[in-house]
UniProtKB/Swiss-Prot annotation:
Source organism: Influenza C virus (strain C/Ann Arbor/1/1950)
Residue ranges of the TM segments: 631-651
Region (Esterase domain-1): 41-158
Function, in words: Binds to the N-acetyl-9-O-acetylneuraminic acid residues on the cell surface, bringing about the attachment of the virus particle to the cell. Plays a major role in the determination of host range restriction and virulence. Class I viral fusion protein. Responsible for penetration of the virus into the cell cytoplasm by mediating the fusion of the membrane of the endocytosed virus particle with the endosomal membrane. Low pH in endosomes induce an irreversible conformational change in HEF2, releasing the fusion hydrophobic peptide. Several trimers are required to form a competent fusion pore.
GO biological process, any: fusion of virus membrane with host plasma membrane
Name the record gives this protein: Hemagglutinin-esterase-fusion glycoprotein
UniProt GO MF annotations: host cell surface receptor binding; sialate 4-O-acetylesterase activity; sialate 9-O-acetylesterase activity
Length: 655
């Protein structure tokens, strides 16, 4: 800390002069009012700057997230890293296989990659899905699977957001009726899906032309390997016939395929005995698959004769922990047809954050692998953020952002505020001024400027760590003014209040994220109102903090002035008499200029003939006059005598 003092001298008798500490403030200073004390400062700055979110994905904790991907996150791909949209570090966090997707592993169409997706993490990032798209041309009793994919991805994101672990269960225990055998279909490239499996029944047209009703059973486990299963995602598949005649060419009954739970309750399927046919004119059935969320247990499947579609796989979730879900848009480059099922599924799932490109996919390794824009959007996965949201991620500590961050959002997210509404605090050169504080009745040292200020402003200081250092609890040990400890004690409660405020804000927003309502806009409007109220409350608290901060530093600096005045009085001994706070009378005949330099300029090299017992060089480190308040002048190795400067001396003699 540096000091700049202006000493003003006035003559009281022919041989005596009066020296006082004098204010040194001009129009370049601004006044800052505080609780218990005010400050003049040469500079000011906002307590916090507005932060801008970075577009793309990030995570709150590197140790608690997991990714599920394909070739664009597959480190084992022969073209890695040119084929990847993530760094090698991030690729290690993904469960990936080139050519794979969650839906391919669920249904297992012939000739496609079948990968066992499983893993645990509070935050799950999904960058997959493109391998089951129109370009894949999967044709098995339907050509367009986009609506099924949309429903599948939506259920995956929903269950993943409520679970710590998830796993594909690729082999369910089952019991198949004796008359049914595993079959293939011409409409499925003379093969069939692994899930559901197709079982057919040979029928003797002359004796039993309609066949027997199929009754089968499957069991959803409570555990698959090391993975606990509290809920399963099951595909309930069945055929849709346009008319009874299309199905019943032999004059038999209506088509049905129904799943029952252990109590006999229908949980999925289609029953044309009670539901009408489509009425269309097609002569080939279409396969439909609904997504069911089922608890572990034994389920039965009943179907009309000849065909049985049997669930063989599921995705299992432990439902132990809620957490963020990030879905990354998964599309092809030029020349390949994509769908937008991932985008639509995420946007319709509470708690899911969607990462979307603004430009077409342009790969580096080939047209479909290694897009620079996607690499930038996913580069945040290498870091930890304080806040993740649909608007992007933030790792700065400021509690405010210019624009409202769109939900869902997680972590310590900044609130929207206008720049001009953020309180300003003093910075640069600081000078305490007078103030009254009835709560300070017995300060541990006499404080100039509280009720008995001398001639006005006394003291100029440069806060080494910047004034923000006091608020954030970080400053150097050296320097004057308030200490880190006193600032922390003074603001501890308010600091805790702010954290509680932030936490309660995030909890409220996360609860709203979890709500499902037919009026989504009403929920968003309510969320915005809550955040605006929180922002105003936080700005109000910061105003209080600013006033306390100014007062705290002002008082601390004034205590430092008392230390300075005490040192001057002690150095002067009987040569100077303190006639009022900050003013001394000296006999000019007894204490000459070198003597005055020693007393008031702290001149360590000047001879002091009038005080022979003292050394001519002073080491303030060992000077007993500086033993005292830790809030006083912190004279340390970093602050030497050379840092003390008398900026001006005026001597006036009176008759």
């Amino acid at each position: 800390m540096f000091f700049s003092l202006l000493l003003m001298l006035g003559l009281t008798e022919a041989e005596k002069i009066k020296i006082c500490l004098q204010k040194q403030v001009n129009s370049s200073f601004s006044l800052h009012n505080g609780f218990g004390g005010n400050l003049y400062a040469t500079e000011e700055k906002r307590m916090f700057e507005l932060v801008k979110p970075k577009a793309g994905a990030s995570v709150l904790n590197q140790s608690t997230w997991i990714g599920f991907g394909d070739s664009r996150t597959d480190k084992s791909n022969s073209a890695f890293p040119r084929s990847a949209d993530v760094s090698a570090k991030t690729a290690d966090k993904f469960r990936s296989l080139s050519g794979g997707s969650l839906m391919l592993s669920m249904f297992g169409p012939p000739g496609k990659v079948d990968y066992l997706y499983q893993g645990c993490g509070k935050h799950k990032v999904f960058y997959e899905g493109v391998n089951w798209s129109p370009h894949a041309a999967i044709n098995c009793y339907r050509k367009n699977w986009t609506d099924i994919k949309l429903n599948f991805q939506k259920n995956i994101y929903e269950l993943a957001s409520q679970s710590h672990c998830m796993s594909l269960v690729n082999a369910l225990d089952k019991t198949i009726p004796l008359q049914a055998t595993a079959g293939v279909a011409k409409n499925c490239n003379n093969s069939f899906l692994k899930n559901p499996a197709l079982y057919t029944q040979e029928v003797n047209p002359s004796v039993e032309k309609c066949g027997k009703e199929n009754l089968a059973f499957f069991t959803l486990p409570t555990q698959f390997g090391t993975y606990e299963c509290k809920l399963h995602l099951v595909a309930s598949c069945y055929f849709i016939y346009d008319s009874k005649e299309v199905y019943n060419k032999r004059g038999c009954d209506n088509y049905f395929q129904v799943i029952y739970d252990s109590s006999g309750k229908v949980v999925g399927g289609l029953d044309n005995r009670v539901s009408p046919y489509t009425g269309n004119s097609g002569d080939t059935p279409t396969m439909q698959c609904d997504m069911l969320q089922l608890k572990p247990g034994r389920y039965s499947v009943r179907s009309s004769p000849r065909f049985l579609l049997m669930p063989e796989r599921s995705y299992c979730f432990d439902m132990k922990e809620k957490g963020p879900v990030t879905a990354v848009q998964s599309i092809w480059g030029k020349g390949r047809e994509s769908d937008h099922a991932v985008d639509q599924a995420c946007l319709s799932t509470p708690g899911c954050m969607l990462i979307q490109k603004q430009k077409p996919y342009i790969g580096e390794a080939d047209d479909h692998h290694g897009d620079q824009e996607m690499r930038e959007l996913l580069s945040g996965l290498d870091y930890e953020a304080r806040c993740i949201s649909q608007s992007g991620w933030v790792n700065e500590t400021s509690p405010f952002t210019e624009e409202y961050l769109l939900p869902p959002k997680f972590g310590r997210c900044p609130l929207a505020a206008k720049e001009e509404s953020i309180p300003k605090i003093p910075d640069g050169l600081l000078i305490p001024t007078s103030g009254t504080d009835t709560t300070v009745t017995k300060p541990k040292s006499r404080i100039f400027g509280i009720d008995d200020l001398i001639i006005g402003l006394l003291f100029v200081a440069i806060v080494e760590a910047g004034i923000g250092g006091y608020l954030l609890g970080s400053r150097k040990v050296s320097g004057g003014g308030v200490t880190k400890e006193s600032a922390e004690k003074g603001f501890e409660k308010i600091g805790n209040d702010i954290q509680i405020l932030r936490s309660s804000t995030n909890i409220a927003i996360e609860k709203l994220n979890d709500r499902i309502s037919h009026d989504e806009q009403a929920i968003r409007d309510l969320t915005l109102e809550i955040e605006n109220a929180r922002s105003e409350a936080l700005l109000g608290e910061l105003g209080i903090i600013r006033a306390l901060l100014v007062g705290n530093i002002s008082i601390g600096l004034q205590e430092s002035l008392w230390e300075l005045a005490s040192e001057i009085t002690n150095r002067a001994g009987d040569l100077a008499v303190e006639v009022s706070p900050g003013c001394w009378v000296i006999d000019n005949n007894i204490c000459d200029q070198s003597c005055q330099n020693f007393i008031f300029k702290f001149n360590e090299t000047a001879p002091v003939p009038t005080i022979p017992p003292l050394d001519t060089k002073i080491d303030l480190q060992s000077d007993p006059f500086y033993w005292g308040s830790s809030l006083g002048l912190a004279i340390t190795a970093a602050i030497s005598l050379a840092a003390l400067v008398i900026s001006g001396i005026a001597i006036c003699r009176t008759k």
